[in-house]
Regions:
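Bacterial Sec-dependent N-terminal signal peptides
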Residues: 1-20
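Serine-esterase "nucleophile elbow" of acetyl-processing enzymes
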Residues: 19-99
Length: 149
């Protein structure tokens, strides 16, 4: 009987511990190594955004390197996820400017329905954080769309 109880407790504990593994919801770790490599290096501009931004560097990586540009786009990200990682992927790099392209995945409801005023608030918060830290903001407009598939 003791063995059954101990075995049951062990199985229960294993399930409980595995259920508590943290999920990297905002993909904080995506650029961890690259950010560490930039410590102390001058950064002119950080590009913060979604898949569109994520793919810009692929067009001409040398252009980014030559000009002190850093790409911190992550495909599929919403403004809430970008805001969550804004300190790590923008402010901590101490750029002169940040280019923000955000909101399209909120409209596509990648994380479920969201009110437009919340999307706006997330974008305003990123802008406020940047300005507070002496970083100029370039805010891009959303691309036009009428449906998502």
């Amino acid at each position: 009987m003791k063995k059954i109880v101990l075995l049951s407790l062990s199985v229960f504990a294993a399930f409980s511990l595995s259920a508590q593994q943290p999920r990297d919801w905002a993909q904080y770790g995506r650029y961890e190594r690259q950010n560490a490599a930039l410590a102390g290096e001058p950064v002119e501009v950080v590009f913060m955004g979604n898949s569109i931004t994520d793919n810009w560097i692929g067009a001409d990586p040398d252009f980014f390197a030559r000009n002190g540009f850093v790409d911190r786009g992550i495909s599929g990200q919403t403004t809430a996820e970008m805001l969550a990682r804004f300190r790590r992927d923008v402010i901590d790099l101490n750029p002169k400017a940040v280019v923000i392209l955000a909101g399209i995945n909120d409209i596509a409801q990648n994380n479920g329905a969201i009110k437009l005023e919340n999307v706006f608030g997330n974008i305003v918060s990123m802008c406020d954080l940047a300005r507070y830290n002496g970083i100029k903001v370039v805010l891009c407009s959303l691309l036009p769309c009428d449906r998502f598939s």
